[in-house]
């Protein structure tokens, strides 16, 4: 009975302990004793408490705290406790220094190759062959004027200097983003609060301020912030799997197992505990420190302690370590604010055991694209070097028949080094260094801005995944409605009151039952407080439905607090707390005569079925038959529900003193044979902005579904008010039990085919359990009923919503009403619990994708042109027209700036005027491909014209076939300058990727873009006019500058011409991808595929969607590339482990599998809107079409599970993980 009989106790000596604590720093129990006690489990712990301290109140006395009043809150006392018992904080690892980040940036293989080549070039440039031998070395050394040989070192030095610049820029980016992340992290941590009792007042304090001796209130959904011992509990069940590996919920009670451990989840019930260990001394903290999260000193110190403990309590530690290996969730202690945690092994275990996302949509596609670009670049650079070396060797030793002289060897080697540098230049050009940075910047920028739109992003990839969302499964309460509940109708003493009745109209005994039942059978943490501002609304604290009932008592001019003062929470004999399965709450009171009375409240149809009597008009109980119940349902409950009211039934039952005491653990026998007191109708108004937000979603091709625990009539009424349902539409509204009946076969197994028949038309799922929600979400995601497979976002607030939130592509948790467990399972937290914030998330998600596409269009144009120019130029003229240092400026510096410029475009409402991208849409739409090839054609024509005819046009010396270490030529400077200016003006073109004509639209709204374009132009002037030998530049005249600018601006005019050409006419673009039928794609690749987005298309045909299909079949090639890419980025920082769920902005992680997902990179479908006017206009106004998932324009052929994948430092987006 001890777990039920939470009766008041005379706390001898405890009440005075508050005063003692302020004067005496010596506690009656040491830190070591508390740690040893918390190591024990269940009966061992209970025995130790009884033997050493008597009971939990004895521990409270020794800790100088009151079980009822808590700590005094005196600052001196709190400081003393922190000094003795520690702070609720795990010191994070020191952030990497700037020099460490510089060293890591230097590990890039491309840069290492350039460094080696530059050093060799530098060393050889100082060698001069004997004068007499110069002629014998052939033409290779002819043409060097006096003194020019001495400047040969400049090129090598300039390359080294460029590498230093690149490294510093990279390191600074990483450093600033890590700093930004830590700032955001600390801000999030400051917002984490927990409820404690101090000075007799229930207050919320930051988790870090909790100290030993605090009396903490725990409730359903909490993640425990510290270790403690239960003082009083109501039906308390804890999920300890994070520490023990046991999946069953553990029932906690004073007489069986009173220990509560940090990092565990409260799955049911409520209670109070005295905090006994915090921070590194708590059970989760000990594990953190053993893993090194607390720093090296802590680790060494705790390793010694661990060894000692192993001898004494080997079993306990072994058990915990085994549990840790089984379930990495031990690392998820929310309140312990470790920003980095765990060594690599534990991190890998955690990832292996905690299902989270695979590669996100964008990451998957960019990974594949980077692999293919890397392959092409490697091939082109190798061919370039081979051709140059062969040409030189054949020309020198075969055609000119020169002998190989030992004295000439250094000169020959210089040539080979020069060829090698040209080859590396081609590789540098081909590898899109700016791409990971563009993703990082775009996501970081979006995440920062989304916080202002009430979206707190925990997983960065969720930000862009929202751009793909085709379906949103939303809760009703608080998300679509205001969560400001009030009782507006009631059925009492056989009368249906359309407004709250006067207390005089209710018989006194019914009023008494009503007041006592509501006061004690609502959580004592639910209360109504006076308004913060004069004239404002009273504040509702705790469960909003219970607050509505308490407000109902206040409307009846009765004060619930008087009843609670008379019957404190400790006097409650037994509480059956509310959960999603029972959908009711019951409280048992023991009367002085030995009799019991139970009060119940819950969903009206559930409680009414358990009622055998009802209080009549005169206040007497009369028999309540099934037909009477049916009458009430038809005349009272259904009319209330059809007005959108939530109906709650209140009832009671007496257990006379003479009868045997019931078996309290058998709830079904206890909560039955009730007497109905009243049925109340609670109004929760729809948020005024929600109907418009839902209309925007439907216009954007997103289907909104309501999943709620309310009855079907209430749900249907609210759905109609919101605009989810429209009169006359053929859509389904189902209750959970009906839904389950339809989707299961005779054996009770769920069948996907059955779900597929329901979900396309389903709009409302009422009376649903969290399991139903998970089943629906999984069913929609896994469905292949149409090619347009779904990307699903889900909102959730309850502990049991965790599975659905994790299964969804994007899980939204409620910041206000959500439990810690729901927040932990989510990807994004809605800080205002408002549906309109989800719409903003969709807008930001689409904007991220657009930003990356813009940069991709710009980057690929630069890459195509530069690779062809470097390759062709090198093969024809024996030298690259664009020198290594110039290419470093173009590719590493300018692209970095361009990624910043294009990735920070603010979103516009027009993003919501088109359908979602979908999972399998190609990354490069045909419009983008048209722009890339069109602009590349213009730029190549200009560059090659200047290269082979420029000297005649400008009447200057030709720069072609210049000897080694020749001075910079005006000719090649004009080529370089024109090339850069064409990229600069093409950056403006790249702002639009849908074929819009006005590329300047909104340009001044983006100050970053304007600043960067102007800044790049200024730097280009400095490089050309003053760069000299290091940049291989010669000063240009005003005329030459004007011609360069004119040719650069030509890209804007050329862009208008390209926009005029209808994409649908360019059939040859189709040849870029070979059609692969759906059935040809191997199942395992289907399972790994990820979402695709393309802006240019409305639909995607089944065939002809895959590019480089052959590459996917050659597994060994991909392994080679993986190895190459791993080495390419091996020096980059490993991502911080998600050791604490405080790390809300944890990093997106992915790896490149041997079996690459089949993702089309080039779109080759015909359906395309070429005119910007079409593209920006809203789709056809058919509500069915807008609101039907089948027409949402998504083509999906794969499953994307939210499961963790280990991070690969070789991934091209790895910088994303390391820098945020």
UniProtKB/Swiss-Prot annotation:
Q: Which domain of life is it from?
A: Eukaryota
Q: Which residues carry this modification: N-acetylglycine?
A: 2
- Biased region (Basic and acidic residues) positions are 312-325, 337-356
State its location(s).
Cell membrane; Basolateral cell membrane; Synapse; Presynaptic cell membrane
Q: What does this protein do?
A: Catalyzes the hydrolysis of ATP coupled with the transport of calcium from the cytoplasm to the extracellular space thereby maintaining intracellular calcium homeostasis. Plays a role in blood pressure regulation through regulation of intracellular calcium concentration and nitric oxide production leading to regulation of vascular smooth muscle cells vasoconstriction. Positively regulates bone mineralization through absorption of calcium from the intestine.
Q: Domain description from the entry?
A: Isoforms A, C, D and E contain and additional calmodulin-binding subdomain B which is different in the different splice variants and shows pH dependent calmodulin binding properties.
The protein's name: Plasma membrane calcium-transporting ATPase 1
User: In the UniProt record, what gene is named as encoding this protein?
Assistant: Atp2b1
């Amino acid at each position: 009975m001890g777990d039920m009989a939470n009766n008041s106790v005379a706390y001898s000596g405890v009440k005075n302990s508050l005063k003692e604590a302020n004067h005496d720093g010596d506690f009656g129990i040491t830190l070591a004793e508390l740690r040893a006690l918390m190591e024990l489990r269940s009966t061992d712990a209970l025995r130790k408490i009884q033997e050493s301290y008597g009971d939990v109140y004895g521990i409270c006395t020794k800790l100088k705290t009151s079980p009822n009043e808590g700590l005094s809150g005196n600052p001196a006392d709190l400081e003393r406790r922190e000094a003795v018992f520690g702070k609720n904080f795990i010191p994070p690892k020191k952030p990497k220094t700037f020099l460490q980040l510089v060293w890591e940036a230097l590990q890039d293989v491309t840069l290492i190759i350039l460094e080696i080549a530059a050093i060799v070039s530098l060393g050889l440039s100082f060698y001069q062959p004997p004068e007499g031998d110069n002629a014998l070395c052939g033409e290779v050394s002819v043409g060097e004027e006096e003194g020019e040989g001495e400047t040969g070192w400049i090129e090598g030095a300039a390359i080294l200097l460029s590498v230093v610049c690149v490294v510093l820029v990279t390191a600074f980016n990483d450093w600033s983003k890590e700093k930004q992340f830590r700032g955001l992290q600390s801000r999030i941590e400051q917002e984490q609060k927990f409820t404690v009792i101090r000075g007799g007042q229930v207050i919320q304090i930051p988790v870090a301020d909790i100290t030993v001796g605090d009396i903490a209130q725990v409730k359903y959904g909490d993640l425990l912030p510290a270790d403690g011992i239960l003082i009083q509990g109501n039906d308390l069940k804890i999920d300890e799997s994070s520490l023990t590996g046991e999946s069953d919920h553990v029932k906690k009670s004073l007489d069986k197992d009173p220990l509560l451990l940090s990092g565990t989840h409260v799955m049911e019930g409520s209670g109070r505990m005295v905090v006994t260990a915090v921070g590194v001394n708590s059970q989760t903290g000990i594990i953190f420190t053993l893993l090194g999260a607390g720093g090296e000193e802590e680790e060494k110190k705790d390793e010694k302690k661990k060894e000692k403990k192993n001898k004494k309590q080997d079993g306990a530690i072994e058990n915990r370590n085994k549990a840790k290996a089984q379930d990495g969730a031990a690392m998820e202690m929310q309140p312990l604010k470790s920003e980095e945690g765990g060594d690599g092994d534990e991190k890998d275990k955690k990832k292996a055991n905690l299902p989270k996302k695979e590669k996100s949509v964008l990451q998957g596609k960019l990974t594949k694209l980077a692999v293919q670009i890397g392959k092409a670049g490697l091939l082109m650079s190798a061919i370039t070097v081979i051709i140059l070396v062969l040409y030189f060797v054949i020309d020198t030793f075969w055609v000119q028949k020169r002998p190989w002289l030992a004295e000439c060897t250094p000169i020959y080697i210089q040539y080979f080094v020069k060829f090698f540098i040209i080859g590396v230049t081609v590789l540098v050009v081909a590898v899109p260094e700016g791409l990971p940075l563009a993703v990082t910047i775009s996501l970081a920028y979006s995440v920062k801005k989304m916080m202002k739109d009430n979206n707190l992003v925990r997983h960065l990839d969720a930000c862009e995944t929202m751009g793909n969302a085709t379906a949103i499964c939303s809760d009703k309460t608080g998300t679509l409605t205001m969560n400001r509940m009030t009782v507006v109708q009631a059925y009492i003493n056989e009368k249906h009151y359309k407004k709250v009745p006067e207390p005089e109209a209710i018989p006194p005994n019914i009023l008494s039952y009503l007041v006592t039942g509501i006061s004690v059978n609502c959580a004592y943490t639910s209360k109504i407080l006076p308004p913060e501002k004069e004239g404002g609304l009273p504040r509702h604290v705790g469960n909003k439905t219970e607050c509505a009932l308490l407000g109902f008592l206040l409307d009846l001019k009765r004060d619930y607090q008087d009843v609670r003062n008379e019957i404190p929470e400790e006097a409650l004999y037994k509480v059956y707390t509310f959960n999603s399965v029972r959908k009711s709450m019951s409280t048992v009171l023991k009367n002085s005569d030995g009799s019991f009375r139970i009060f119940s409240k819950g969903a009206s149809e559930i409680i009414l079925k358990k009622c055998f009597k009802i209080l009549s008009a005169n206040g007497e109980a009369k028999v309540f038959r099934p037909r009477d119940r049916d009458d009430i349902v038809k005349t009272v409950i259904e009319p209330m529900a059809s007005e959108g009211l939530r109906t709650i039934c209140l009832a009671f039952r007496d257990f006379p003193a003479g009868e045997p005491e019931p078996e309290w653990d058998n709830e079904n026998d206890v909560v039955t044979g009730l007497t109905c007191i009243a049925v109340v109708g609670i109004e929760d108004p729809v948020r005024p902005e929600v109907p418009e937000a839902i209309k925007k979603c439907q216009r954007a091709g997103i289907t909104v579904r309501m999943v709620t625990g309310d009855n079907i009539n209430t749900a249907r009424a609210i759905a109609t008010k919101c605009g989810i349902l429209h009169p006359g539409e053929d859509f389904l509204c189902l209750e959970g039990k009906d839904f389950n009946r339809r989707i299961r076969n005779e054996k009770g197994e769920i069948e996907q085919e059955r779900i597929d028949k329901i979900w396309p038309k389903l709009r409302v799922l009422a009376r649903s359990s969290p399991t139903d929600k998970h089943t629906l979400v999984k069913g929609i995601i896994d469905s292949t009923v149409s090619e347009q497979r779904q990307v699903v976002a889900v909102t959730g607030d309850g502990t049991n919503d965790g599975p659905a939130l994790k299964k969804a592509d994007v899980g939204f948790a409620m910041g206000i009403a959500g439990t810690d467990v729901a927040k932990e399972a989510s990807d994004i937290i809605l800080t205002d619990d408002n549906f309109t914030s989800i719409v903003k998330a969709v807008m930001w998600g689409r904007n991220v994708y657009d930003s990356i596409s813009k940069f991709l269009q710009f980057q690929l144009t630069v890459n195509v042109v530069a690779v062809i120019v470097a390759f062709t130029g090198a093969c024809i003229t024996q030298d690259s027209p664009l020198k290594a240092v110039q290419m470093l400026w173009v590719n590493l510096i300018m692209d970095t700036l361009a990624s910043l410029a294009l990735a920070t475009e603010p979103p516009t409402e027009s993003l919501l005027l088109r359908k979602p991208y979908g999972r399998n849409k190609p990354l490069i739409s045909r419009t983008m491909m048209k722009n890339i090839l069109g602009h590349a054609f213009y730029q190549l024509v200009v560059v090659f014209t200047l290269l082979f005819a420029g000297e005649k046009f400008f009447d200057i010396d030709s720069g072609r076939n210049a000897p080694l270490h020749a001075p910079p030529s005006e000719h090649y400077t004009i080529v370089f300058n024109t090339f850069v200016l064409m990229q600069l003006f093409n950056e403006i073109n790249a702002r639009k990727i849908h074929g819009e004509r006005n590329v300047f639209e909104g340009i001044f709204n983006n100050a970053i873009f304007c600043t960067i374009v102007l800044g790049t132009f200024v730097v280009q002037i400095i490089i050309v006019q003053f760069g000299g030998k290091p940049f291989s530049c010669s000063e240009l005249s005003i005329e030459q500058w004007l011609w360069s600018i004119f040719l650069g601006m030509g890209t804007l005019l050329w862009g208008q011409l390209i926009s005029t050409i209808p994409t649908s006419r360019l059939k040859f673009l189709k040849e870029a991808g070979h059609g692969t039928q759906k059935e040809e794609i191997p199942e395992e690749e289907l399972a790994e595929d990820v979402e695709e987005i393309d802006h240019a298309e409305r639909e995607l045909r089944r065939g002809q969607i895959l590019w480089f299909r052959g590459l996917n079949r050659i597994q060994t090639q991909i392994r080679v590339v993986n190895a190459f890419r791993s080495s390419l980025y091996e020096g980059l920082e490993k991502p911080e482990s998600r050791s604490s769920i405080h790390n809300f902005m944890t990093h997106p992680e992915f790896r490149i599998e041997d079996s690459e997902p089949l993702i089309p990179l080039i779109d080759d479908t015909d359906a395309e809107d070429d005119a910007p006017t079409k593209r920006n206009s809203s789709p056809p106004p058919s509500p069915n079409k807008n609101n039907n998932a089948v027409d949402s324009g998504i083509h999906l052929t794969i499953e994307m599970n939210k499961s963790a994948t280990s991070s690969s430092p070789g991934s091209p987006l790895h910088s994303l993980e390391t820098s945020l």
